[in-house]
């Protein structure tokens, strides 16, 4: 059994089954996903987890950020919105999809139907993965379980790409990991309650943070519009990252302890870089306060 760090035990003394082990990957959707994929791959030297390819009604490619894969998705047909945005988080279930659905029902968590995706290999069809949409905040993004049927093989690809990133010294930015995915919700109390039901986790404070082993944490913050607001990425040295981004003209806001990649350079996404040795990621309120108080005079906006 996979066990989620921080799982609580039931009053009877028996531990109920863990439902989620980690953030398996997260993804962005863009009208120009392949161009962004190539930019992150070549400019930031992120190793390939899987090459950009068409899968029928969508196309995607994946790159590693150390402890998690980032998927670049291009959807075929009309989208409700244009541009680029972080759009979804895939959670790995502890067991298979059928067991996960049974546990979702037991916990009273609203969810969608099982959806199997079929791959064709050597003329033979096989189920590559099964997903289950979770009806939990934010409304502006998709949170879902993703059950890869060849999980060891998938994990091996992730691990090899992560090892390659480490061998490259994290690339020119010195990337080590994704520290946090920040989700904006209109009601932190409501959203936190639904995430707690899913994860058996009791976060504290005004901005609840849910932890997943060595993967990225998920932070919930109050926002007028629901969705995935930003990611916080750990780097070896903010000085090194600042110099690289300055040289390339892609440095955004730079304040004490953190820097931001210029959103226009990455499709409008907000990607915050913090030094890995720092004790924790800044809260969104702290980040906004620092940004207002100590804007770098050389920062392009």
Where are these regions (language model features)?
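Hydrophobic/aromatic-rich structural module bridging two neighboring secondary-structure elements via a short loop
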Residues: 72-113, 118
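A structural feature that tracks compact, well-ordered secondary-structure segments
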Residues: 74, 208, 219-223, 232-234
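Alpha-helical subdomain
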Residues: 224-227, 254
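Core segments of cupin and vicinal oxygen chelate
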Residues: 18-20, 27-70, 112-126, 171-217, ...
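Vicinal oxygen chelate
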Residues: 101-174, 215-219, 239-301
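N-terminal beta-strand motif that seeds the catalytic metal site of vicinal oxygen chelate
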Residues: 11-34, 84-91, 147-190, 226-233, ...
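Bacterial N-terminal signal peptides
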Residues: 1-5
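N-terminal Sec signal peptide cleavage junction
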Residues: 7-9
């Amino acid at each position: 059994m996979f066990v989620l760090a921080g799982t609580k035990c039931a009053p009877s003394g028996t531990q109920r089954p863990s439902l989620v082990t980690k953030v398996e990957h997260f993804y962005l959707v863009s009208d120009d996903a392949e161009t962004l994929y190539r930019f992150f791959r070549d400019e930031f030297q992120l190793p390939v987890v899987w090459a950009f390819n068409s899968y029928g009604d969508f196309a995607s490619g994946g790159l590693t950020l150390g402890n998690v894969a980032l998927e670049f998705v291009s959807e075929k047909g009309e989208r409700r919105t244009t541009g680029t945005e972080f759009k979804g988080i895939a959670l790995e279930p502890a067991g298979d999809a059928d067991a996960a659905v049974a546990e979702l029902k037991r916990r009273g968590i609203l969810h969608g139907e099982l959806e199997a995706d079929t791959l064709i290999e050597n003329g033979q069809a096989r189920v590559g993965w099964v997903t289950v949409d979770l009806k939990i905040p934010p409304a502006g993004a998709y949170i879902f379980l993703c059950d890869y049927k060849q999980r060891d093989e998938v994990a091996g690809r992730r691990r090899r790409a992560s090892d390659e990133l480490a061998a490259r010294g994290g690339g020119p930015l010195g990337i080590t990991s994704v520290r946090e995915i920040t989700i904006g919700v209109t009601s932190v109390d409501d959203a936190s309650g639904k995430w707690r039901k899913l994860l058996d986790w009791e976060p504290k404070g005004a901005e609840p943070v849910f932890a997943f082993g060595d993967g990225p944490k998920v932070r919930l913050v109050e926002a007028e519009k629901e969705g995935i607001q930003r990611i916080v990425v750990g780097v070896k040295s903010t000085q090194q990252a600042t110099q690289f981004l300055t040289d390339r003209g892609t440095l955004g806001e730079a304040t004490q302890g953190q820097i931001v990649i210029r959103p226009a350079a990455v499709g409008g996404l907000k990607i915050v870089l913090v030094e890995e040795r720092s004790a924790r990621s800044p809260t969104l309120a702290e980040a906004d306060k620092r940004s207002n108080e100590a804007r770098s005079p050389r920062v392009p906006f």
